[in-house]
C-alpha cells in the first residue's frame, strides 16, 4: 500500500492512472471479500470510488489509505463473523472511523487526556459493535455509551484496532494470571475488587453470561436491561466490558469517568467466574443459558437474560430487599452486584474471592491491607450519582454502611459472612480516614519543622487564613498528598494548596534566603516569567543621556523617552531603577577603593575597546561591534564615554569620568585629538589637528591606546570644556597654545571649532605637577542635553592656563559656582585631593567623600537653576 501511495504522489499521469487502477482493483477485491456490495453502504462505495478516480491528489491519497486500512480491518471482522447475517456496517461507523483515524494520524494533533489514554490502552472505546456481531439494526446506530457525542469526540477510538479474538485471548490470559495469583497466595494485588457502587460483582450471572454469551459475540447488552433503555442497543465492547457495569438505577452508562474501572471489573468478574466454575457444587447454581447462536435477535437475548435473572431472584427473594422488582425488566447486570443472587452461593464457596468472600476475621485484615495499598483500581475517578437502586439499597438495614461492624463481629443474620457490600460512602470514608492519618503524620512533621524554623514562613500561610500552615479538614488530605507530587513534577500548586507548606519547599525557601517571596511569587514566576529586555545601542545611548540629566526623571520624561526609544514606559522605569542601583554600587566601591589607596591607583572601570576606545561596561561585544558605524556618522553626537582617555603625569590626580553626559564634543567634529604624554611627564608635540569644520571619518584613530601608560594612570575620558560663546577668545583651530603657556606647564588646550557658531567645544587636557586638576576645572562648562554651551567667565580661561598654582587653585574654586557636576555619571568625581606639591589638603575618608560630592552637586545645581542654564524637561 505504501509503495502504491508513493507512485500516486508522482506527477506522471500514466503512473497516477496505473495507481488508480491498482487501488480500484484492491478496493473491489476487498469489497468482494467483505461480503459483496450489499454489506457496505452505497454512499461509502460511491465515495471511495470517487476518491479512487482522483488519486493524483495527495490529500485524497491520504484519505484513501486511511479508508483502505479501515476496509482491511473490516475484512478481519468479516472473517471472524461472516456466519452472522446480522452484521451491518453503518455509514456513521465508517465515517467515524475515517474521522478518528485522521485525528490520530493527521495534523490536528489533538491532545490526549488521561481518560482517553486509559480507554485506548484498555480497549474500552473499541465500539465497532457491528463487526463484533452485536446484531444491531442499521437504524439503531448510536453509541453504547448512551451519550453519542462522547464517542464521536474521542480521539483514541480503537474500534478497528483490535479484533474480538485478540481481546478475548488477552482477557483469558489476564484472567488466568489473576486466578493463578489468587490461588497461589492470597489477596489480589489490585486492592478490593468490590466496586464502589456498594455491591459485589454478581456471580451466578457472571459465569455463564461472561463466558457463554459474551465470548460468543452476543455482547452483553444486558447492561441496558435494567436501565429503561431496552431499545438502546449498546456496542459490543461496551457491553463486553460493562456487563455488570456502572449504569445504576434509572440512568445508563452516562459517566465517562467511570470507564477506567470497567475493564478491571470485568477482569475480577472473570476470575471469580472461573473459580466458581471449578467449585460449583454449591446450592442453587444458575440455569445454563442457551448458546449464543440460538438467540434469533437481540430482543430474545435480553428476554432470556431477564427470565434467568427473574428465576434467580425468585429463588432468593428473602435477600432481595434492595433490588427493584417492579420497574420493568429486573436489572441484574445493571449494577455491580445484586445481593439476592449471590447471597446463597457465598457460604458454600468461600474460595470465591479471598478478599471479599473471606471470614469475619479476614475482613478487617483485608480492609486494612486495602487501605495501605491505596490501589483501588476498580473505583471510578469520581463517585458517580446513584439512582433508585442506590436509594433502596441504602434503606435496607443489613446492606447499609453499618453492615461492616456487624460483619466483622459475626453478627450477620444467617451466619453469612461472605456478603459485605461496600457503598460509595464507605469507600470514601475509608480513603478519608487513611488520608487523615497521613495528614496527621505530615502535620506532626511540619510542626517539628516549624519549631526548628521559627516564624519565618508563618506570614505566607496567614495570607490564606491558615497561620500555622496546617489543615485539619479531611478534604485537604488529598491536597497534602498531591502537594509533594506537584512540586516534584514542577507544576504550580493551586491557591488552596498554599495552605499546606511543604517541608521541602520550606527548605528551599530558607536556603535561598528569599523570605520576602511566598509561594504565590513562585507560582507567578512560572506562569508570568517575562523575557529579559535586550536594549539596542541606540536605546542605551538615549537612556544614558537621560540618566545624565536626571537620576529621577518624572513620569512625563519617562513617557517621552519611552516613545523615543520605542520601549514601554515600565521598562524605562525599571532601567532607571537598575541604573541608579548600579551607580550607587559603583560610587560606593570607588569611594572605598579611592579611600584605601589614597588615590594612587584610580578605578579602572572604563576598559579599552578594540580600537583603543575606553567604553563603559554595558557596551558588551555585540554592542561594540555596532560602534564603528555609530562613530563614523558625521552628525553623531559623541558622549563622553567615547572620548579619548586622559593621560596624566604621576603626580597629578584625575577625577573619575562622568560618562554619558549630555554635553557634546562638537556637533559635527570628531573627538579632539589626544595629546599623548609619557609616563614621566615629558611633553610630546601634539599630532596635527583635523582640518577646520571637516569631521574626521575615523576620529577614533587619534585615540592613543592606554597600554603604554603607567599602571597608576587612570583610564578615563576627560571632561571637555565647552566654551559657550565666541567672545571667550578661543584660539583658532590648530593653533597650539604653547606660546601662551609658561615653560613649566605642559598643559595643552586644543580648541576645536564647531561648524555651528552657537557651540564650540574644547578639550582641556592638563598635565604636569603645577596645574591643579581639581574636579572643577575638569568638568567646567559641560554642555547640557540641548547642546548649548555654558557661559564661562573669561578669567576662568586665564586661570586654567596660569602658571601660578595658587591662582590656579583660586580660579578652580571660583569656577565651582558655575560648573555642573554630572548627576548621571556612574560615579561622582572625588573632591579636590592633595596633588604632587600644589596642595596640603589631607586625604578624606569615604563618608566625607560622598557627603562632599553631594554638597557640590546640590550647590552647583542650585546655581545653575538660578542662572537658568539647566532646562527642566
Swiss-Prot record:
A motif (Nuclear localization signal) lies at residues 855-859. One of its GO terms (molecular function) is RNA polymerase II transcription regulatory region sequence-specific DNA binding. The keyword Flavoprotein does not apply. Keywords: Developmental protein, DNA-binding, Homeobox, Nucleus, Transcription, Transcription regulation. Pfam families: Homeodomain (PF00046), OAR (PF03826). GO terms for cellular component: nucleus. CDD domains: homeodomain. A motif (Octapeptide motif) lies at residues 116-123. Residues 224-235 have a biased composition (Basic residues). Residues 528-587 bind DNA. Residues 127-137, 293-316, 438-474, 702-714, 731-763, 835-844 have a biased composition (Low complexity). Its main location: nucleus. Residues 683-694 have a biased composition (Pro residues). It is found in: Nucleus. One of its GO terms (biological process) is positive regulation of transcription by RNA polymerase II. A motif (OAR) lies at residues 849-862. Residues 127-157, 183-240, 278-339, 374-528, 662-810, 822-850 are annotated as: Disordered. Residues 483-513, 774-785 have a biased composition (Polar residues). Appears to function in brain development. Belongs to the paired homeobox family. Bicoid subfamily. This is Retinal homeobox protein Rx.
Amino acid at each position: 500500500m505504501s509503495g502504491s501511495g508513493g507512485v500516486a504522489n508522482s506527477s506522471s499521469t500514466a503512473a497516477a492512472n496505473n495507481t488508480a487502477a491498482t487501488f480500484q482493483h484492491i478496493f473491489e477485491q476487498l469489497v468482494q471479500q467483505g461480503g459483496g456490495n450489499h454489506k457496505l453502504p452505497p454512499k461509502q462505495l460511491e465515495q471511495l470510488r470517487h476518491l479512487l478516480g482522483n488519486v493524483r491528489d495527495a490529500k485524497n491519497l491520504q484519505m484513501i489509505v486511511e479508508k483502505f486500512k479501515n476496509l482491511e480491518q473490516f475484512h478481519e471482522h468479516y472473517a471472524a463473523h461472516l456466519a452472522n447475517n446480522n452484521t451491518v456496517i453503518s455509514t456513521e461507523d465508517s465515517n467515524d472511523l475515517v474521522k478518528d483515524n485522521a485525528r490520530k494520524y493527521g495534523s490536528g494533533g489533538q491532545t490526549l487526556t488521561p481518560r482517553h489514554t486509559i480507554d485506548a490502552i484498555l480497549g474500552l472505546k473499541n465500539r465497532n459493535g457491528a463487526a463484533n456481531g452485536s446484531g444491531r439494526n442499521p437504524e439503531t446506530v448510536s453509541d453504547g455509551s448512551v451519550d453519542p457525542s462522547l464517542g464521536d469526540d474521542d480521539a483514541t477510538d480503537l474500534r478497528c484496532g483490535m479484533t474480538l479474538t485478540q481481546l478475548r485471548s488477552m482477557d483469558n490470559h489476564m484472567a488466568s494470571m489473576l486466578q493463578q495469583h489468587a490461588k497461589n497466595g492470597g489477596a489480589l494485588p489490585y486492592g478490593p475488587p468490590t466496586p464502589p457502587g456498594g455491591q459485589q460483582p454478581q456471580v451466578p450471572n457472571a459465569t455463564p453470561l461472561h463466558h457463554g454469551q459474551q465470548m460468543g459475540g452476543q455482547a452483553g447488552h444486558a447492561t441496558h436491561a435494567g436501565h429503561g433503555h431496552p431499545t438502546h442497543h449498546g456496542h459490543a465492547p461496551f457491553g463486553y466490558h460493562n456487563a455488570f457495569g456502572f449504569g445504576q438505577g434509572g440512568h445508563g452508562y452516562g459517566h465517562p469517568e467511570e470507564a477506567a474501572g470497567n475493564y478491571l471489573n470485568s477482569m475480577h468478574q472473570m476470575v471469580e467466574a472461573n473459580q466458581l466454575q471449578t467449585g460449583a457444587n454449591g446450592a442453587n447454581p444458575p440455569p445454563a443459558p442457551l448458546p449464543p447462536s440460538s438467540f434469533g435477535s437481540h430482543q430474545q437475548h435480553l428476554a432470556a437474560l431477564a427470565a434467568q435473572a427473574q428465576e434467580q431472584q425468585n429463588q432468593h427473594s428473602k435477600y432481595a430487599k434492595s433490588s427493584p422488582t417492579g420497574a420493568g425488566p429486573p436489572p441484574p447486570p445493571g449494577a455491580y452486584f445484586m445481593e439476592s443472587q449471590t447471597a446463597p452461593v457465598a457460604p458454600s464457596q468461600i474460595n470465591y474471592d479471598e478478599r471479599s468472600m473471606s471470614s469475619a476475621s479476614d475482613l478487617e485484615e483485608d480492609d486494612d491491607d486495602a487501605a495501605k495499598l491505596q490501589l483501588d483500581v476498580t473505583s471510578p475517578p469520581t463517585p458517580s450519582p446513584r439512582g433508585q437502586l442506590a436509594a433502596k439499597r441504602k434503606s435496607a438495614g443489613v446492606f447499609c454502611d453499618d453492615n461492616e461492624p456487624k460483619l466483622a463481629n459475626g453478627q450477620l443474620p444467617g451466619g453469612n459472612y461472605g456478603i459485605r457490600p461496600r457503598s460509595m460512602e464507605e469507600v470514601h470514608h475509608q480513603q478519608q480516614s487513611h488520608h487523615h492519618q497521613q495528614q496527621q503524620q505530615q502535620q506532626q512533621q511540619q510542626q517539628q519543622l516549624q519549631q526548628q524554623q521559627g516564624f519565618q514562613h508563618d506570614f505566607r500561610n496567614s495570607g490564606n487564613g491558615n497561620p500555622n500552615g496546617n489543615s485539619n479538614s479531611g478534604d485537604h488530605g488529598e491536597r497534602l498528598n498531591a502537594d509533594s507530587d506537584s512540586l516534584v513534577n514542577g507544576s504550580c500548586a493551586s491557591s488552596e494548596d498554599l495552605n499546606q507548606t511543604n517541608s521541602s519547599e520550606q527548605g528551599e525557601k530558607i536556603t535561598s534566603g528569599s523570605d520576602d517571596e511566598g509561594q504565590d511569587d513562585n507560582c507567578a514566576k512560572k506562569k508570568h516569567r517575562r523575557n529579559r529586555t535586550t536594549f539596542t545601542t541606540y536605546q542605551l545611548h538615549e537612556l544614558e543621556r537621560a540618566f545624565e540629566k536626571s537620576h529621577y526623571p518624572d513620569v512625563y520624561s519617562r513617557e517621552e523617552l519611552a516613545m523615543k526609544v520605542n520601549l514601554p514606559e515600565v521598562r524605562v522605569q525599571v532601567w532607571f531603577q537598575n541604573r541608579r542601583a548600579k551607580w550607587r554600587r559603583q560610587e560606593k566601591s570607588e569611594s572605598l577603593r579611592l579611600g584605601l589607596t589614597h588615590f594612587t591607583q584610580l578605578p579602572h572601570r572604563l576598559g579599552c575597546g578594540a580600537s583603543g576606545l575606553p567604553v563603559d561596561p554595558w557596551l558588551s561585544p555585540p554592542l561594540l561591534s555596532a560602534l564603528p558605524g555609530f562613530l563614523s556618522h558625521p552628525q553623531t553626537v559623541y558622549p563622553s564615554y567615547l572620548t579619548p582617555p586622559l593621560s596624566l603625569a604621576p603626580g597629578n590626580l584625575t577625577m573619575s569620568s562622568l560618562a554619558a553626559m549630555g554635553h557634546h564634543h562638537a556637533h559635527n567634529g570628531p573627538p579632539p585629538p589626544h595629546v599623548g604624554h609619557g609616563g614621566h611627564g615629558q611633553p610630546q608635540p601634539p599630532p596635527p589637528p583635523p582640518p577646520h569644520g571637516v569631521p574626521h571619518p575615523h576620529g577614533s584613530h587619534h585615540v592613543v591606546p592606554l597600554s603604554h601608560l603607567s599602571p597608576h594612570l587612570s583610564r578615563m575620558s576627560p571632561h571637555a570644556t565647552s566654551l559657550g560663546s565666541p567672545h571667550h577668545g578661543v584660539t583658532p583651530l590648530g593653533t597650539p597654545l604653547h606660546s601662551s603657556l609658561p615653560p613649566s606647564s605642559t598643559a595643552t588646550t586644543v580648541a576645536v571649532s564647531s561648524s555651528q557658531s552657537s557651540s564650540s567645544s574644547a578639550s582641556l587636557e592638563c598635565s604636569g605637577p603645577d596645574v591643579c586638576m581639581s574636579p572643577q576645572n575638569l568638568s567646567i562648562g559641560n554642555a547640557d542635553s540641548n547642546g548649548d554651551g555654558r557661559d564661562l567667565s573669561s578669567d576662568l580661561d586665564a586661570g586654567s592656563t596660569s602658571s601660578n598654582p595658587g591662582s590656579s587653585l583660586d580660579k578652580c574654586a571660583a569656577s565651582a559656582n558655575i560648573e555642573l557636576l554630572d548627576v548621571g555619571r556612574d560615579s561622582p568625581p572625588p573632591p579636590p585631593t592633595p596633588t604632587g606639591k600644589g596642595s596640603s589638603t589631607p586625604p578624606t575618608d569615604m563618608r566625607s567623600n560622598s557627603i562632599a560630592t553631594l554638597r557640590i552637586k546640590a550647590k552647583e545645581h542650585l546655581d545653575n537653576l538660578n542662572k537658568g542654564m539647566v532646562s527642566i524637561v
